[in-house]
Amino acid sequence: DPAWKSSPLHRAILQSYLAWSDAVSSYVDKVDLDEQDRARARLLSGILVDALAPTNALFGNPAALKKLVDTGGESLWSGLKNYVTDLVENGGMPSQVDSRPFKVGKNLATTPGAVVFRDKMFELIQYKPTTAEVWRRPIVITPPQINKFYSLDLTPEKSLVQFLLSEGFQVFCISWRNPKPEHRDWGLEDYVDSVANAVDVACKVTGSDDVSMMGACSGGITSCAYAAREAARGSSKLKTLTLAVCTLDPATADETTLGSLITPFTIEAAREH
């Protein structure tokens, strides 16, 4: 925004903020800490510096001030309404998207399909073929346990499921149950058993001896654990495995932002909650 240069007040705010940001970063780099503690300090100080950016406050944001004037105060009123909505409907956390326009089955996850299997941990969806002929071997999709099955079937224009169907594949997708406190003992072995059940059902429905599998994120970790177990047992039910956004080597965790927060204490705290 030109105001950062033309307005003496905003120019002073900007320069003060940048100088303070550099000072914080320099201090973290110089203080006597081991590498993991330094990584944590960088992360936390970065969050603090970003949170206190002048643009996060109305009077420190020239673009917001201009919009306030141009709209006759409507932008401020709209922001206050969003704030109240977040307080009432989102636990006080800022909403990242407006979820009101999205309705599952209406304009989200619209690919026709049916649940062909259900147990305490998941449902298995078989999607309706869109081609006259289909490949015998089905594809079983294992989505993340912390996401929805329709992350791969958002809209007709943004749907891996619809693309696979158009290529003649028989597509099955796991829909994980949202666990509650009473399900806290569900572990990796339980989720691997669920993947095995999904594969068995897909084979039974299609008459195929094996499947191709795609695992995404934590679903990819589960798929790999399933693949390793099947290989150890000499099973040939898994023909191919495709992984998406899936980290398998925990040794690289220290090189990530979240990796700096991994300690015995934080792991135990996560398990308790």
Set out the residue ranges of the language-model regions.
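N-terminal cap/leader regions of alpha/beta-hydrolase-fold enzymes
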Residues: D1-H273
